[in-house]
Amino acid sequence: SVPPPVYGCHTPTDSCTGSQALLLRTPYNSDNLYQMTSQLECMTWNQMNLGATLKGHTTGYENDNHTTPILCGAQYRIHTHGVFRGIQDVRRVPGVAPTIVRSATETNEKRPFMCAYPGCNKRYFKLSHLQMHSRKHTGEKPYQCDFKDCERRFSRSDQLKRHQRRHTGVKPFQCKTCQRKFSRSDHLKTHTRTHTGKTSEKPFSCRWPSCQKKFARSDELVRHHNMHQRNMTKLQLTL
């Protein structure tokens, strides 16, 4: 859940959403800041202009000697432009306190964007990766094949491109040893092992806790991981 705005300008009410009230000050450490930004993006799915909210509350900060606001100034937007290493959704503004910038820069957190879907705590380095992942939960498939009589839809643009090669016959991945061509890079990698003698090689390992399965192809690992995720979701729903 979104961290409580105990150091915010005001307490959330029916007329003021929690995201608007999360105008945090320095008592929040860098870990809280990472959580706050990732949750805001995950819950709103769009850019937020909080300038109007800030205008009504920054005037009282000048006389506050105990804490300095992390975000101060008349306007800012939460969107994809990093100011802290690993954070992609806070715009660089003059009012960011230098001590907070250093604290966040020194953190070891590499994946600040966490999925808020119940039972799923997957994290991503980029907001766009989180948005792609979220479509697995929502079932959204915005990319549609425009070939005649097909109309198949996909959640990711690269999936659509890979699918369309079935229609066009394009095989852009060529083996350097025998010049055989493939429509997918992972199929080429699997084929290449027939030349190197490493046909039993399985370089893709499952990172799910207590699972040590390995696979020869990345798409096999993806299907296997999705199985874990479905089982986890079912378990959460029964609790």
Curated annotation (Swiss-Prot):
Site feature Important for interaction with target DNA, where: K214, E220
UniProt GO molecular function: DNA-binding transcription activator activity, RNA polymerase II-specific; DNA-binding transcription factor activity; double-stranded methylated DNA binding; hemi-methylated DNA-binding; RNA binding; RNA polymerase II cis-regulatory region sequence-specific DNA binding; sequence-specific DNA binding; transcription cis-regulatory region binding
InterPro entries assigned to the protein according to its UniProt record, in alphabetical order: Wilms_tumour_N, Znf_C2H2_sf, Znf_C2H2_type
Linked residues for Glycyl lysine isopeptide (Lys-Gly) (interchain with G-Cter in SUMO2): K234
SUPFAM superfamilies xref list: beta-beta-alpha zinc fingers
Any single GO BP term: male genitalia development
Signal peptide feature range: none
PROSITE patterns: ZINC_FINGER_C2H2_1, ZINC_FINGER_C2H2_2
Localization per Swiss-Prot or TrEMBL: Nucleus; Cytoplasm; Nucleus speckle
Motif (9aaTAD): 43-51
Keywords: Cytoplasm, DNA-binding, Isopeptide bond, Metal-binding, Nucleus, Repeat, RNA-binding, Transcription, Transcription regulation, Tumor suppressor, Ubl conjugation, Zinc, Zinc-finger
Family from the record: Belongs to the EGR C2H2-type zinc-finger protein family.
Subunit structure: Interacts with ZNF224 via the zinc-finger region. Interacts with WTAP, AMER1 and SRY. Homodimer. Interacts with WTIP. Interacts with actively translating polysomes. Detected in nuclear ribonucleoprotein (mRNP) particles. Interacts with U2AF2. Interacts with HNRNPU via the zinc-finger region. Interacts with CITED2.
Name of the protein in question: Wilms tumor protein homolog
Gene: WT1
